[in-house]
């Protein structure tokens, strides 16, 4: 074999070994990776340090907001999902807009709704001690 062939064989061998080391490292830390993902999943749609944001479209409700409490997110409330931020809940005209699935909430919040009503149960004339207000404060 000539020196060029030996060089390329060594480079390919090193590359394959590096890939195998990475796969083995992921295998060893898989439980830690799952725990990290579970812990940081509420921040999935927030722009935070070292956390990437997932955009469902080119422009969404969180693109121009840098305060994490002001960002819209989907949270399970009772047996349904609601879209909330520190401004309140996305409303359907009468009350809080509820979704049966998390994907339905995400699709509406980050794709469908650009201008929708917002209901804040913590400001008058609403009761600041209501269940909805308490949940809103605890979710933020």
Swiss-Prot record:
It comes from the Viruses. The lineage of its organism: Viruses, Varidnaviria, Bamfordvirae, Nucleocytoviricota, Pokkesviricetes. Belongs to the poxviridae A28 protein family. Residues 22-140 are virion surface. Contains two intramolecular disulfide bonds. They are created by the viral disulfide bond formation pathway, a poxvirus-specific pathway that operates on the cytoplasmic side of the MV membranes. It is a single-pass type II membrane protein. GO terms for cellular component: membrane; viral envelope; virion membrane. It is found in: Virion membrane. This is Envelope protein A28 homolog. It comes from Myxoma virus (strain Lausanne) (MYXV). One of its GO terms (biological process) is symbiont entry into host cell. Pfam families: Pox_A28. Keywords: Disulfide bond, Fusion of virus membrane with host membrane, Late protein, Membrane, Signal-anchor, Transmembrane, Transmembrane helix, Viral envelope protein, Viral penetration into host cytoplasm, Virion, Virus entry into host cell. Envelope protein required for virus entry into host cell and for cell-cell fusion (syncytium formation). The chain crosses the membrane at residues 1-21.
């Amino acid at each position: 074999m000539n020196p060029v062939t030996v060089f390329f064989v060594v480079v390919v061998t090193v590359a394959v070994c590096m890939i195998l080391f990475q796969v083995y490292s992921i295998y060893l830390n898989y439980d830690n990776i799952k725990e990290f993902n579970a812990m940081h999943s509420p921040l999935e749609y927030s722009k935070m340090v070292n956390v990437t944001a997932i955009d469902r479209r080119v422009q969404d409700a969180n693109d121009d907001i840098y305060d994490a409490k002001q960002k819209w997110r989907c949270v399970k409330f009772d047996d349904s999902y609601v879209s909330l931020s520190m401004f309140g809940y996305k409303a359907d005209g009468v009350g809080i807009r509820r979704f049966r699935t998390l994907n339905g909430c995400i699709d509406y919040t980050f794709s469908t709704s650009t201008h929708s009503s917002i209901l804040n149960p913590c400001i008058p004339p609403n009761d600041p001690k209501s269940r909805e207000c308490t949940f809103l404060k605890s979710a933020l």
